[in-house]
Swiss-Prot record:
InterPro entries: Chaperonin_Cpn60_CS, Cpn60/GroEL, Cpn60/GroEL/TCP-1, GroEL-like_apical_dom_sf, GROEL-like_equatorial_sf, TCP-1-like_intermed_sf. Its main location: cytoplasm. CDD domains: GroEL (cd03344). SUPFAM superfamilies: GroEL apical domain-like, GroEL equatorial domain-like, GroEL-intermediate domain like. The keyword Nucleotide-binding applies. This is Chaperonin GroEL 1. It is found in: Cytoplasm. It catalyses: ATP + H2O + a folded polypeptide = ADP + phosphate + an unfolded polypeptide. Residues 526-546 are annotated as: Disordered. GO terms for cellular component: cytoplasm. It comes from Burkholderia ambifaria (strain ATCC BAA-244 / DSM 16087 / CCUG 44356 / LMG 19182 / AMMD) (Burkholderia cepacia (strain AMMD)). Belongs to the chaperonin (HSP60) family. The gene is groEL1. ATP binds at residues 30-33, 51, 87-91, 415, 479-481, 495. Residues 534-546 have a biased composition (Gly residues).
């Protein structure tokens, strides 16, 4: 085990605070509509230019071990806020730096760090309650577009695209972000349920122009095992042929004579069928088959439920208005499932989302909810260069998270104004002793900091603007983009309540930990081993004259 360096008290804290300041100073220049760019070196390819706080924070690793510890703790604030609310990373970093900076002054003057932390926690709890009170619901397309635009660094086209996507697929719908092929942003909407499995044979295609198989008013047969013997399928195929309607078969796999017979029947026009593999793997496959069954009003033919292919009837088959099967995707439009059953299934999957432990599982479950609830929208990001594409894509993803947060918990006035207004709830607070009161003062001061930084980045005098905004009421604030004092909500400068709340809570949490740190343990830097001695010189000339 490598030797460790153990540092105590002020020496440990001051080194860690240096790291906090290095990271925060690099991140906070990006805050606000007039935030500056930060250039990030890449190990291959050109550098990345960004105004995204969390992207800057993620790149920072410091050489000094203790400084790096402090920087990593604040990096945690940024990434936690980004994970929970999708935005507010720079605000959280600015708040954390301010709480640490002010707190260190009090700790240095001999105050009890634990009481300071109690005061900080008390003030933050009161501020969060006040933020919830002044929050207003975000329901209209215009408000959603405003939130998206602000989060995407005042890019209105991104906000408009997100609002349009939410309008098409609903607030719960899945919206994904992909690289576009042109310079302009595009929006593609897939209605109904789509899953990533296509036809098993190109001979099923009946629309050569689009290279898809289209089935109008089809039956849907769902089976959780492989089908290779056509005899298993014959009874149900005969019933479907009598009904004179097409059939989509979704099974674990369809191969051998079963697939060959379906293809021959299709070519001869005896029975219009398409076979596709079931989506997903393992337990997720079972769940997705069940989703399709509920959406189409059918049942999964599975031995567990006592159903077999030979005994299947039309009653067990699902139905839909239209199904399109391409090379890689299958889309079921307007399934015949009952609305109440679909709603119950959506509730069940939402409950699983709450309990999911991994981000991957949560994402897959959210996709299932959206497919059941009504559709998927894809925003294709357009840009002239790859560097611009990466930067813009990151902004679109941030804006998307922020708009979801706004729909969830509502919106407050942006530009740091909501935090200034929430200070009113703290002003009258008192702690159990002078040290706790100092903790409350620390938070009061920190809540001005985001507005100060926005104004500073815009090249104006921060103290004057903060005093003017604090003297105002309600949504009155400073619009840094235009340099005017306006009603922030009317001007469209709004933040999701969840973003502001999460930023404040996470910043206070990590800053409190730093202030109450009394020892730090880090690996000692390794000393480079001396270079081995060189080889002795080569033999000289032999002195032989030829």
């Amino acid at each position: 085990m490598a030797a460790k360096d153990v540092v105590f008290g002020d020496s440990a804290r001051s080194k860690m605070v240096e790291g906090v300041n290095i990271l925060a100073n690099a991140v906070k220049v990006t805050l606000g509509p007039k935030g500056r760019n930060v250039v990030l070196e890449r190990s291959f390819g050109g550098p990345t230019v960004t105004k995204d706080g969390v992207s800057v924070a993620k790149e920072i690793e410091l050489k000094d071990k203790l400084q790096n510890m402090g920087a990593q703790m604040v990096k945690e604030v940024a990434s936690k806020t980004s994970d929970n609310a999708g935005d507010g990373t720079t605000t959280a970093t600015v708040l954390a730096q301010s709480i640490v900076r002010e707190g260190m002054k009090y700790v240095a003057s001999g105050m009890n760090p634990m009481d300071l932390k109690r005061g900080i926690d008390k003030a933050v709890a009161a501020a969060v309650e006040e933020l919830k009170k002044i929050s207003k619901p975000c329901t209209t397309n215009k408000e959603i577009a405003q939130v998206g635009s602000i989060s995407a660094n005042s890019d209105t086209s991104i906000g408009d695209r997100i609002a349009e996507a939410m309008d098409k697929v609903g607030k719960e719908g899945v919206i994904t972000v992909e690289d576009g092929k042109s310079l302009a942003d595009e929006l593609d909407v897939v209605e109904g349920m789509q899953f990533d499995r296509g036809y098993l044979s190109p001979y099923f295609i009946n629309n050569p122009e689009k290279q898809v198989a289209v089935l109008d008013n089809p039956f849907v047969l769902l089976h959780d095992k492989k089908v290779s013997n056509i005899r298993d399928l014959l009874p149900v195929l005969e019933q479907v042929a009598k009904a004179g309607r097409p059939l989509l078969i979704i099974a674990e796999d369809i191969e051998g004579e079963a697939l060959a017979t379906l293809v021959v029947n299709n070519i001869r026009g005896i029975l219009k069928t398409v076979a596709v593999k079931a989506p997903g793997f393992g337990d997720r496959r079972k769940a997705m088959l069940e989703d399709i069954a509920i959406l189409t009003g059918g049942q999964v033919i599975a031995e567990e439920t006592g159903l077999t292919l030979e005994k299947a009837t039309l009653a067990e088959l699902g139905q839909a208005k239209r199904i399109e099967v391409g090379k890689e995707n299958t889309t079921i439009i307007d399934g015949a499932g009952e609305a109440a059953s679909i709603e119950a299934r959506v509730k069940q999957v939402r409950a699983q989302i709450e309990e999911a432990t991994s981000d991957y599982d949560r994402e897959k479950l959210q996709e299932r909810v959206a497919k059941l609830a009504g559709g998927v929208a894809v925003i294709k990001v357009g840009a002239a260069t790859e560097v611009e594409m990466k930067e813009k894509k990151a902004r679109v993803e941030d804006a998307l998270h922020a708009t979801r947060a706004a729909v969830e918990e509502g919106i407050v006035a942006g530009g740091g104004v909501a935090l200034i207004r929430a200070r009113t709830a703290i002003a009258s607070l008192t702690g159990a002793n002078a040290d706790q009161n100092a903790g409350i003062k620390i938070v009061l001061r920190a809540m001005e900091e985001p507005l100060r930084q926005i104004v500073t980045n815009g090249g104006e005098e921060a103290s004057v603007v903060v005093a003017a905004v604090a003297a105002g009421q309600g949504n009155y604030g400073y619009n840094a983009a235009t340099g005017e004092y306006v009603d922030m909500v009317e001007a469209g400068v709004v933040d999701p309540t969840k973003v502001t709340r999460t930023a404040l809570q996470n910043a206070a949490s990590v800053a409190g930990l730093l202030l109450t740190t009394d020892a730090a343990v880090a690996e000692l830097p390794k000393e480079d081993a001396p270079m081995p001695g060189g080889m002795p010189g080569g033999m000289g000339g032999m002195g032989m004259d030829m």
